[in-house]
């Protein structure tokens, strides 16, 4: 359902429909621009964009991780209403969901996306070409984007080979260059009609790679910094150069005054390259370089460091230059804003509000800028609510709520929950009414998305032909044969992600069991019961953690109970602890006789609520 066309949409008659370019720089921190006074970065083109437009001091991400925040940006919904709320990779939009692109397409816009999508892997209902994009070129799954030298990129769900590339940092064709060139081709092709060019580029997100021939590397290669810190800064400068190239192209085509450009990060800064001298990261993305005032936290949590992003908007002749705005807004507001600029009508079920009055002027638009009653975020058990100067946050599942006065404590250092229980109660009530269970899209061909995730490592071939040296294998010597095992029960499994319990005993390290995390997160303790196929002497257990790029669910504390029948005694046979490693781990104990084994899991290596197992086997005969 779409809202009736509001009266203010008639401004289209006064302003011809604009072209819209939205550039997202992945993981770029709020302070990581030279216009913010940062001495490590040189970003003259982005600085000029700010000088000729408006820079926002309180623009906030939709979430603090890649996929969830992009879903908020695309759909106009906050993370209590979105379909993509986890960052495991590939989680899809539902088939019927509207995006910025689909809204603009209805009013005649050409729509192109170039970079990292994150709202649905190949073979799912969330692919961009099903959500309004005429073309999308780049990465669909964010794990695929963890290499700048993948063997292929994706164009409208079809693979585009990249010659000479072998994954990770090994290759000759730098993906980011191709992505920017495709965006330029799109702009040239559509110069005579209104277009929406969405450019969610991957740099400076890791793996931190930049060709030695890139002019940005020459600026940083001799700095007395850690290598990856130099590469990161060079990647930021490279993105800046490409922002300049996009603007140069618009000038060349006579489109500069017909095009509004948005530039932002996607979530709060990641505090990379920490050491004793740089406890908030070598570049301090969440530390004011001029005053030392800090935003607490960073990417992955809901403190200000995880949500505050750079946001600049420029439209020559329409937006007054050199403005700095303190308007409080966030990613769900982007869709209604762009829809209004295009003379389009956004869906009626969005959470965002248009900020066009703030951009163009209330006198020009003919109405005052609307304000949010409150803003809402949720992420893997974390919850945050912002109302005016007050922010309530629950930093994790089962943790106490905290309350901060951001007007006087932007660093979130003084918890005022005890002093202002009524305010906290009000914000907690807003949080409760803001959450709806997530309803994700579906996969018809999950194997395509899995292939793209493996392509990070250079795997462009079917699973049966994978070079197994890319992952650790669990040694089979001394194990009771896995082929006889059977899953009796499990506490939960992530069925929507095809992370089933049976994969813990299938002998393939590339698949794994993961406990349910969507639509609801299942918390510890987790349990797996396995039938060994007959009575055996059991003297140990062998465990292999998941072999992809994440650690979610990797087991730490657990106990193991054996029995000759499906009924288990109260006392466990042995208590165990595993480490954070990709290599197989073995834990031996005094031998017992049994057919059934119950593994009960109490904690995860990173403190999360999940459990996952790539392979598990039992030592004995």
Where is each model-derived feature located?
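Predominantly extracellular/luminal cell-surface or secreted proteins
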Residues: 264, 314, 491, 544-546, ...
